Amino acid sequence: MAAAGGLPASATLLLLVIAAVAVAPLASAVRPVSDAHRSAAAELFAASPDGSFGDLETTYEAVRTFQILGVEKDKGLIGKACKFAAEKLASSSSSPAKDLFHAARISGVLKCSVDSGVYDDVATRLKAVIKDTNSLLELYYSVGGLLSIKEQGHNVVLPDADNTFHAIKALSQSDGRWRYDTNSAESSTFAAGIALEALSAVISLADSEVDSSMIAVVKNDIVKLFDTIKSYDDGTFYFDEKHVDAAEYKGPITTSASVVRGVTSFAAVASGKLNIPGEKILGLAKFFLGIGLPGSAKDCFNQIESLSFLENNRVFVPLVLSLPSKVFSLTSKDQLKVEVTTVFGSAAPPLRVNLVQVLGSDSKVITTETKELQFDLDNNVHYLDIAPLKIDVGKYSLVFEISLQEQEHETIYATGGTNTEAIFVTGLIKVDKAEIGISDNDAGTVESVQKIDLQKDTSVSLSANHLQKLRLSFQLSTPLGKTFKPHQVFLKLKHDESKVEHLFVVPGSARQFKIVLDFLGLVEKFYYLSGRYDLELAVGDAAMENSFLRALGHIELDLPEAPEKAPKPPAQAVDPFSKFGPKKEISHIFRSPEKRPPKELSFAFTGLTLLPIVGFLIGLMRLGVNLKNFPSLPAPAAFASLFHAGIGAVLLLYVLFWIKLDLFTTLKYLSFLGVFLVFVGHRALSYLSSTSAKQKTA
C-alpha cells in the first residue's frame, strides 16, 4: 500500500486520463497511401516566396511526388519550374551531368516545351560524359538524362551500349553491392540501386539487344543483393548500408528506395523474371507504408516514388492487409473489418481471407478455428463478427491467411501467406460486491459495514479515530466473467479544511480489490489533521469503457494532537490566474443626511441675504441716477455699453453658479469675462478721463 500526500486536485483526473488513453503499443499500422500523404507532401514541398522549390534536384522531387499523388499545383509554379529546367538545358556546356539529368526529368514530368535542338545538344554533351568517365554517379546521371529525353519523344540512341553496360558492371562486387568508382575501397547498397537503374537505362537506349549473358549475371547479383536485406519480426524488410563512411551513409529509407527503383526498373526491361521471394517485396512495401507520414521532403519523395514502383512492377505486386480500425468494442458489437489492397489502395484480385489463429497478449493461443471472412464488394472490405470468437477485453494478435482464387495471379501478386495484426478489445466492466466500513485496530472486528453501488456517486458517512482502520473492497469482472485488473485503481482522501490530498493504490488479488488504511500508521502522513475527509475512488483502464472517478462520501477522523516537531501540511498551490478572477464586491452605505432647519429660519436667512441689495437700490433712488457723463461719440459709447453689459454678464454668471454651474466651469467663464471687462472698461474710462481733463483746462 502506497500513499502520496499533497497532490493537486487534478492528479487523480490526470491518472485516469493516462489509464484511458495509454493503450500499449500495437504493431505499426500499415495503411495504403491516403489523402493524409497528399496533405503532407503539399506541406513538405512548399514553394518559396519566389515560387521555386530550391535546386533542380529538389524541384524534380517535388513535381514527381505531386505527379504520383495527383496533387494539383498552381500553373504559375509549373511555369517557373519549366523555365528553370529549360534555362539549365540551354545553358553552356559547363553544366554538370547531374543538373542536366534533373532538368530533363523535370521537363518530362511537367511536359515542358523544349526545342529539339536543345535536346540534341544536351544528348551530345551527355554522351561525351559517358565516354570520358568511370564514375558510377556520372554514368547514372548521363544515361538517365538520355533516357528521359528519349521518353519525351526524341530519337536518342546509345551507340556503344555494350561497353557502357560493361563499364557499370565492372564496379559490382561479389555480394551484389556496387562501388562508386574504380578507386573506391568500399562497396555500397545505395550504389547498387543506382547501378541497376543505370543498367536498365542502358538496355532501353541500346540500338540492339544487350548481351543476354551479362543480363543473367546482373540478375544473379540482384539475388545476392537481396540476401543482405534486413528484417523485423513483423515481416518488414529494408536495406541499409554495411560499412561506409559517415559522409556516404544514406539511411534505410534512401537506401531501400534506391534498391527498389533499381530492381523494378531493371525487371521492367530485362527478359524473364527475377528470382526474388514475394515476401521480401511485400516486406519492402510494409517498410515504406510503416513510415506513415514522413518528416522531411526527401523521405516523402523516397517513400512515394518507391511505392509507385512497387504498385506496378514485373517482380511481384504487393498486396497489403490492413485494418481500418484496431480497436473494437464488445458493447457495440463491432465487426472485424479487413482490407486487402495494393499500396495505393487499388482493389486486389479475387482472394480469400481466413482468420486462422487468435493469440492473447502473452502469446497464448486463444483459438485455432479457421473462420473465413465475408467479402463486401461495394466497400471492398472483408468482415467477420467478433462475438463468436469468444474473446474478452484486452490485447490480441490475429493471424490472417490470404489465398488468391486464381492460380495465374500467384506469379503476379505477393500476399505474404499469413499476416499478423494486433487489435485491442474494450467493453463494460462489471463492478459489484463493493463494501466500505470501519474496524478496530487490534481485533479487526468490523464495527460498521455499508454496501455501496460504485456505478453512481454515494454519500456514506463514517467516523474513526487513530486506533481504527478503514476497509474498502470490491470486485471487477469482464463481460465473460473473468477477473479484471485495471491499470489504475486509487483511493483519494481529501481534508476538507486544508484541501490536502492523499492517494492510495488499491491492491488487487485474484478475487477482489481490497485496501485497509491503518490510521495509526498514517497519522504523520495525515499531518495529525483531524476533521472531515472526502472519499473518492478512481478506476481506469484503456479496455474499460466505464472507467470512473466516483465520490464515496466522507469520514470524520479524530487524530491525536500534533507533537512539537511534527511536519506541517504543505502549502496549497495558488492558481496564478486567480488574480484575474472576479473581485470581492464592496458594500457601502452613505450616511443619513443632517436634519434640516425649520422653514421660518430658512426664509429669515434668505431675507437677510437680500437685504444689502435692497439697501443698494434705495441708495440709488435717494442719490438719483443720471446719464450725463455717458459718452455721446459712437466708439466710446460702444465701449461703455459693452462694459455695463459685461458687468451684467458677471452678475448672471454668479446666479448660474448658485443654480446650475460648478466652480470650475464658473471660473473658466469668469476668466474670459474678466479679460473682456478689463479691455472695454479701460477704453471707456480713458475716454471719460480725457474729457474731464479738457473741461478743466477750458
From Swiss-Prot:
The keyword Signal applies. Pathway: Protein modification; protein glycosylation. Residues 30-600, 660 are lumenal. Residues 1-29 form the signal peptide. Component of the oligosaccharyltransferase (OST) complex. Subunit of the oligosaccharyl transferase (OST) complex that catalyzes the initial transfer of a defined glycan (Glc(3)Man(9)GlcNAc(2) in eukaryotes) from the lipid carrier dolichol-pyrophosphate to an asparagine residue within an Asn-X-Ser/Thr consensus motif in nascent polypeptide chains, the first step in protein N-glycosylation. N-glycosylation occurs cotranslationally and the complex associates with the Sec61 complex at the channel-forming translocon complex that mediates protein translocation across the endoplasmic reticulum (ER). All subunits are required for a maximal enzyme activity. This is Dolichyl-diphosphooligosaccharide--protein glycosyltransferase subunit 2. It comes from Oryza sativa subsp. japonica (Rice). The lineage of its organism: Eukaryota, Viridiplantae, Streptophyta, Embryophyta, Tracheophyta.
